[in-house]
């Protein structure tokens, strides 16, 4: 066992003495040492229950003959960090999480690990650590939040975010606004739609790194506790089998995950996280792969924010495996999963307990919601290296659109303008200097997009940015524009009134000015100076472009 290096032989007596100080017995020294990597904290709804999941995991480890040791990672709530300086720290936390797991696991020579993440950057951070370390590992994602129920409708965090715009426009009363605030977020779990956290949980299951059913089992559901305990038991077997993440996850696994992503209308943040994850697995995953697979994979289930269904409905309809069952003819069914079975073998054992709901909300390949998948990659003179849009959540009349630019150099300025009523139907809002380097940190523009949505403008106004979006964003919102403004990309050269062409079917995003004019603007471009200190300064120096996954070397 790997852990023998800290507990075997006379020279390790000091090590054993310290371990015994924590309560480890001589008989336990002979057992596998399992890290329980928990991102629990009590400021994030998606994490507030993870201590209970950790206890179930540890019970499972003990049942199977292992010795659990729990430690914690940081976790940022994108919802609480939204709309202010705090959002600059969200994406950079991904690498901090990965690095801290590496430090703890390498320093203490664990034999295996159970990873317990939840929420947007925490799940990819844990997954990236699994790929980098390549010791036996299994992931227990924290589970979705139940939707709230307000004014006879299911609600979620995006209901509140869009309520800000609706309230500022006088469309809802203060009483209605307060009801949304008080009742939309129902308790523990990651936000209730197919936003980034739940998308990444689905990616984890599709990649084969969590047990079947884990992604959509809700935070407060007994299923989640059972899966946690079973995962604790399974990790001990994984150690004995020496079945590591790199033996499970292959290039074909990533193709499977992207096809699931397209079928469920997942968050555009997968175009950041999956390439970064592939990098840690020693694999390549170019941005173009998402578009290639999107063209081949139909959109099969309409989930929030682009549709009416919540993860609650998705789970009851069969969850990730039910979608994979629909996609079976396209998937690589021979890919291994963490339970030791292939995807095909797991699907053979799938029981659909609510067949009527399954048939109602998960469509077929022959009769999909959309013929193409949820995400499209656009390129052109405004985004030579690419940009992304959740096409499944865009009104069809905005798929081909040209309009004048309204340019802002940060989200705050755009937000003030939107709430003041300065943005009119027909405009294209451009928010720049929000990329990985320019922010730094590549903030999400949810406050701005939700304000547009709340004011009823997402059927007549587009937003283009080198920043990114919440998984809860809907409408013609194009992000990850690369190269970013801070690197002198064309988005830095846009002026108020310039015409911008969006053509999603043709995958085009163009700035409608002459090449000569673009060259003249480029020649006089001087990037703004930033005064950044601390971790963000180091991040700004090391981070790569969004089209590479925003990896940090």
UniProtKB/Swiss-Prot annotation:
Mg(2+) binds at residues 78, 120-121, 444. GO terms for molecular function: 2 iron, 2 sulfur cluster binding; dihydroxy-acid dehydratase activity; hydro-lyase activity; magnesium ion binding. The active site is at 470 (proton acceptor). NCBIfam families: ilvD, PRK00911.1. HAMAP family: IlvD. The gene is ilvD2. It catalyses: (2R)-2,3-dihydroxy-3-methylbutanoate = 3-methyl-2-oxobutanoate + H2O; (2R,3R)-2,3-dihydroxy-3-methylpentanoate = (S)-3-methyl-2-oxopentanoate + H2O. Its cofactor is [2Fe-2S] cluster; Mg(2+). It comes from the Archaea. Gene3D superfamilies: IlvD/EDD C-terminal domain-like. Pathway: Amino-acid biosynthesis; L-isoleucine biosynthesis; L-isoleucine from 2-oxobutanoate: step 3/4; Amino-acid biosynthesis; L-valine biosynthesis; L-valine from pyruvate: step 3/4. InterPro entries: Dihydro-acid_dehy_C, DihydroxyA_deHydtase, DiOHA_6PGluconate_deHydtase_CS, ILV_EDD_C, ILV_EDD_N, IlvD/EDD_N. Belongs to the IlvD/Edd family. PROSITE patterns: ILVD_EDD_1, ILVD_EDD_2. Its EC number is 4.2.1.9. Keywords: 2Fe-2S, Amino-acid biosynthesis, Branched-chain amino acid biosynthesis, Iron, Iron-sulfur, Lyase, Magnesium, Metal-binding. Binds 1 [2Fe-2S] cluster per subunit. This cluster acts as a Lewis acid cofactor. Functions in the biosynthesis of branched-chain amino acids. Catalyzes the dehydration of (2R,3R)-2,3-dihydroxy-3-methylpentanoate (2,3-dihydroxy-3-methylvalerate) into 2-oxo-3-methylpentanoate (2-oxo-3-methylvalerate) and of (2R)-2,3-dihydroxy-3-methylbutanoate (2,3-dihydroxyisovalerate) into 2-oxo-3-methylbutanoate (2-oxoisovalerate), the penultimate precursor to L-isoleucine and L-valine, respectively. One of its GO terms (cellular component) is cytosol. One of its GO terms (biological process) is isoleucine biosynthetic process. Homodimer. Pfam families: ILV_EDD_C, ILVD_EDD_N. [2Fe-2S] cluster binds at residues 119, 191. This is Dihydroxy-acid dehydratase 2. The modification N6-carboxylysine is found at residue 121.
């Amino acid at each position: 066992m790997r852990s023998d290096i800290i507990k075997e032989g006379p020279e390790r007596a000091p090590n054993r003495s310290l371990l015994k100080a924590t309560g480890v017995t001589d008989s336990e020294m002979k057992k596998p040492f399992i890290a329980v990597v928990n991102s629990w904290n009590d400021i994030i709804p998606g994490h507030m229950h993870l201590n209970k999941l950790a206890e179930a995991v540890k019970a499972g480890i003990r049942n199977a003959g292992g010795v659990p040791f729990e430690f914690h990672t940081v976790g940022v709530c994108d919802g609480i960090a939204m709309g202010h300086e705090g959002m600059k720290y969200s994406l950079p936390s991904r690498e901090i999480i990965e690095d801290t797991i590496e430090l703890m696991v390498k320093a203490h020579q664990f034999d295996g690990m159970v990873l317990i993440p939840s929420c947007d950057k925490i799940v990819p951070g844990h997954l990236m650590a699994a790929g980098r370390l390549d010791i036996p590992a299994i992931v227990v994602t924290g589970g979705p939040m139940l939707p709230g129920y307000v004014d006879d409708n299911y609600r979620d965090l995006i209901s509140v975010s869009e309520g800000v715009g609706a309230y500022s426009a006088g469309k809802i009363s203060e009483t209605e606004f307060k009801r949304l605030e008080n009742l939309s977020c129902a308790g523990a779990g990651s936000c209730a739609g197919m936003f980034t956290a739940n998308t990444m949980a689905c990616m984890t299951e599709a990649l084969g790194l969590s047990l079947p059913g884990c992604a959509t089992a809700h935070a407060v559901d007994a299923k989640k506790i059972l899966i946690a305990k079973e995962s604790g038991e399974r990790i001990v077997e994984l150690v004995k089998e020496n079945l590591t993440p790199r033996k499970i996850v292959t290039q074909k696994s990533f193709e499977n995950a992207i096809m699931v992503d397209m079928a469920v209308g997942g968050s555009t943040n997968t175009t950041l996280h999956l390439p970064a994850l592939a990098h840690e697995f020693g694999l390549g995953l170019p941005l173009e792969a998402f578009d290639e697979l999107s063209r081949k994979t139909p959109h099969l289930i309409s989930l929030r924010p682009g549709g009416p269904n919540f993860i609650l409905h998705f789970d009851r309809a069969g969850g990730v495996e039910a979608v994979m069952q629909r996609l079976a003819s396209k998937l690589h069914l021979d890919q291994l999963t963490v339970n030791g079975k292939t995807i095909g073998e797991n699907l053979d054992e799938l029981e659909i307990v609510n067949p009527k709901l399954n048939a109602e909300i998960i469509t077929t390949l022959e009769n999909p919601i959309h013929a193409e998948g949820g995400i499209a990659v656009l390129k052109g003179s405004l985004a030579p290296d690419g940009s992304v849009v959740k096409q499944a959540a865009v009104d069809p009349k905005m798929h081909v659109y040209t309009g004048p630019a309204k340019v802002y150099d940060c989200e705050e300025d755009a937000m003030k303008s939107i709430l003041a009523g300065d943005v009119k139907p027909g405009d294209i809002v451009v928010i720049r200097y929000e990329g990985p380097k320019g922010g730094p940190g590549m903030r999400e523009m949810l406050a701005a997009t939700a304000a547009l949505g709340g004011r009823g403008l997402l059927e007549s106004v587009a937003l283009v940015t080198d920043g990114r979006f919440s998984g809860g964003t809907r409408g013609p919102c194009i992000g990850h524009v690369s190269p970013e403004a801070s690197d002198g990309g064309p988005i830095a050269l846009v002026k108020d009134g310039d015409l911008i062409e969006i053509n999603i079917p043709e995958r085009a995003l163009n700035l409608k000015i002459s090449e000569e004019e673009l060259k003249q603007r480029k020649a006089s471009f001087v990037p703004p100076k930033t005064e950044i200190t601390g971790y963000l300064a180091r991040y700004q120096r090391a981070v790569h472009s969004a089209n590479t996954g925003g990896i940090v070397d």
